[in-house]
A protein has these predicted regions:
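Short, solvent-exposed positions on alpha-helices
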Residues: 62-66, 108, 257, 388-393
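Bacterial N-terminal signal peptides that target proteins for export
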Residues: 2-11
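Charged, flexible cofactor/metal-binding loops and thiol motifs
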Residues: 122-127, 131-138, 142, 149, ...
């Protein structure tokens, strides 16, 4: 009995390994640290800053400032207990302050409104998530760049209109996506400049009669400055921001799905040259078809990226056809799509780390079709002054001849080329009677590696240009990493200063 049970377990083990993580639950996401950095947290930070600034500016007495600080801290301490109520809007937060500090504490609300405060909270929360997205995108781009560098010499077929078109370096192909994702990072940086401006002091839309120090408030909250026009700050930009973020999310999602589909088409082949390593939740098996190793993380990332596109378009529809001042399309902080965007970026990073690339199989695939035919026409013109269209006609006839006989470029002989050429030359008086190409020239024109070597323009897959592009991409990536860290550090330092100054006020 024991032997039978052991045998059953051993037979099941390969299936469990293949299943990886597809039918088992994904690892649980790490619990958010407590207390969370939610609306309650940021309303607390705004109240701290208001109390400090208004005391310093003599809008509150020193005694009031200290007393109000104690009440604010009492509310924050109570809300930090597990299971405690953490009000998320101004009108439900304020009663807690009144209970802790009496009605006088509402003096800190002079010149403020739920509108500028909650807009500020939403921006602060999205800002934090945007910097996390930036870090994730940098990490994924670095993975992609390293993969491209490792496969500069891997020759692959590239496709246009779904048909094998030209040979290329896998490194060159991947560098194009590095450029694409670095443009996405540039969009994030540009959006961050517009996002990271403080609305505080706009009140509702026309400011306030209280001489609030908007610049100090902006500095305490880690902003780069103030959103100057108070109507724009409170009513126009909050509707515009989700649309711009939606455009960034859409661009990232489309780059994801494009790259995923380049990989997915290989899964239709019995012998792919690029696929996912099995196990670790990358693939999963079929319950009915033993041969299948379904590309689970590709499917999941594509689905989530496509869903993200729908959410991004939804941002525009929410803001469409409403006047400023309506809440329909406003920036919503934690409910915006930045987290979803970060999720698909992290998924793509995992995909790139899981790729199993077979250079020999890629070259075999390349040599099964006539992607070299344009090079034959090019060499005819470059070396023998044959008009391109005449050379193109000759190369096209080679393809027709070879495909009819199931001949690949590797097996196509010089004698067969001469045979095709004579038929073409017989009806084209502008052509020499004999094939001007030498056997060596024809062989080199059919060689994918030779085609890559012979590229002569800036930005091509030839080695010298690849080194330039690798260096440029690395420089851009390093600059993006530095920008993200600097932005994050500025926010952290502002928060440290605010908390330290508030502690001093408490004393």
């Amino acid at each position: 009995m024991k032997k039978k049970k052991l045998k059953t377990i051993l037979l099941a083990l390969p299936l469990l390994v293949l299943l990886g993580g597809a039918y088992f639950p994904e690892p649980a996401e790490a619990a958010e640290p407590w207390p969370p950095r939610d609306n309650f947290f940021w309303l607390g930070q705004i109240n701290k800053a208001s109390d400090i600034i208004n005391t310093d500016e003599n809008l509150l007495t020193k005694e009031e400032g200290r007393r109000f600080a104690a009440a604010i801290q009492k509310v924050l301490d109570a809300g930090s207990q597990k299971g405690a109520e953490r009000p998320s809007v101004v009108i439900t937060f304020e009663p807690f302050l009144i209970k802790a500090g009496g009605p006088d504490i509402t003096k800190i609300h002079a010149g403020r409104s739920s509108q500028d405060m909650l807009t500020t909270v939403s921006i602060l929360r999205q800002r934090e998530q945007l910097l996390q997205l930036s870090a994730a995108l940098n990490q994924m781009t670095e993975t992609l760049l390293n993969l491209a560098a490792a496969h500069e010499g891997t020759l692959i077929p590239n496709y246009t209109n779904g048909v094998q078109a030209q040979p290329n370096s896998l490194g060159h192909f991947l560098l194009a996506y590095v450029d694409a994702y670095e443009r996405d990072q540039e969009r994030i940086k540009e959006y961050y400049k517009r996002l990271n401006r403080s609305p505080m002091g706009a009140t509702v839309l026309n400011g306030t009669g209280w001489p609030l120090n908007r610049d100090r408030m902006a500095a305490y909250l880690g902003f780069d400055g103030i959103a100057y026009n108070t109507y724009d700050a409170g009513q126009v930009f909050p509707q515009e921001a989700p649309i711009e973020m939606g455009a960034i999310a859409s661009s990232i999602a489309i780059h994801n799905t494009s790259l995923i589909q380049e990989i997915m088409q290989q899964y239709a082949q019995p012998r792919p040259w690029i696929l996912l390593r099995e196990g670790n939740g990358n693939t999963y098996v079929s319950s009915a078809m033993p041969q299948k190793r379904n590309p689970g993380i590709l499917n999941r990332c594509r689905t989530d990226s496509s869903t993200l596109l729908g959410l991004a378009v939804g941002e525009a529809f929410r803001a469409h056809n409403i006047p400023a001042g309506m809440a329909d399309g406003r920036i919503r902080g934690n409910d915006d799509i930045v987290k979803d965007t970060t999720n698909v970026v992290n998924q793509m990073n995992r995909i790139l780390q899981a790729l199993d690339i077979k250079p020999e199989r890629a070259l075999e695939e390349l040599n099964l079709d006539w992607t070299c035919s344009q090079e034959i026409a090019d060499v005819m013109m470059r070396k023998h002054n044959i008009p391109f269209r005449s050379g193109h006609h000759f190369a096209s006839e080679i393809v027709t001849f070879a495909r009819a006989r199931n001949i690949t470029p590797v097996d196509f002989t010089y004698a067969q080329a001469q045979e095709v050429y004579r038929k073409v030359a017989a009806v084209d008086a502008s052509l020499p009677k004999e094939l001007p190409l030498t056997p060596e020239e024809l062989k080199d024109a059919k060689d994918p590696a030779g085609i890559i070597r012979n590229r002569a323009v800036k930005g091509g897959p030839q080695h010298n240009e690849m080194q330039i592009m690798f260096a440029n991409a690395r420089n851009v990536l390093n600059a993006n990493i530095t920008w993200q860290k600097n932005a994050e550090n500025k926010v952290k330092n502002a928060e440290i200063k605010l908390n330290n100054d508030f502690i001093r006020l408490l004393r």
